[in-house]
């Protein structure tokens, strides 16, 4: 909320925002306060999909990678703001690191995991299985470029730019089939 004089405004009414944990608790706590008050959520950057993420996120602290320590903090923060089955505190964990995703899912069983890196960055349905709980829930898979610009991919080029919507629909249908198939075959 933004206070202007005696009036309070809601400039954006998003349900979740992404938060960088490297400011520490005093940088995250204001967001947790909003989670509690408004039943909104945050996704905390834990293990991102970009190739250089390991420069910091994989650093060892007392024999453990930093991303695991951040994952534990996400789980602790999440206990403060539980929804029906999942916490309002989720995590960003890249599809390009499925083994780390498996470890982090165990650390954060009640957190939604936002999974970038599917499609354009190389993540495939089989890579995503560790991010989901055993019931097939708990992960939100993102594929921005793979969907928005599907018509630029060889597979969907026949649609052309003028039919980008149809190309995007086909890409989404293929993505659903890929992920669903991988989850069924786990």
Feature names for model-found ranges:
Residues 3-7, 133-140, 161:
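A polyampholytic, Gly/Pro-enriched intrinsically disordered region
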Residues 25, 64, 68, 98, ...:
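Electropositive phosphate-/nucleotide-binding environments in soluble metabolic enzymes
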Residues 33-36, 59-62, 105-110, 129-133, ...:
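Short, solvent-exposed amphipathic alpha-helical segments in soluble enzyme
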Residues 128-134, 149-186:
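C-terminal helical cap(s) of enzyme catalytic domains, especially alpha/beta-barrels
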């Amino acid at each position: 909320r933004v206070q202007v004089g005696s009036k309070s405004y809601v400039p954006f009414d998003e349900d979740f925002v992404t938060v960088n944990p490297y400011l520490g608790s005093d940088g995250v706590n204001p967001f947790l306060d909003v989670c509690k008050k408004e039943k909104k959520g945050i996704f905390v950057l834990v293990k991102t999909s970009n190739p250089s993420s390991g420069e910091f996120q994989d650093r060892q602290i007392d024999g453990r990678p930093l991303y695991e320590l951040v994952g534990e903090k996400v789980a602790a923060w999440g206990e403060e703001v539980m929804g029906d089955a999942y916490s309002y505190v989720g995590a960003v964990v890249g599809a390009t690191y499925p083994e780390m995703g498996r470890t982090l899912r165990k650390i954060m069983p009640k957190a939604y995991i936002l999974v970038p890196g599917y499609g354009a960055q190389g993540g495939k349905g089989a890579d995503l299985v560790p991010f989901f709980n055993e019931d097939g829930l708990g992960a939100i898979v993102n594929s921005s470029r793979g969907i928005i610009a599907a018509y630029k991919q060889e597979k969907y080029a026949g649609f052309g730019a003028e039919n980008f919507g149809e190309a995007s629909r086909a890409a989404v249908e293929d993505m659903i089939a890929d992920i669903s198939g991988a989850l069924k075959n786990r």
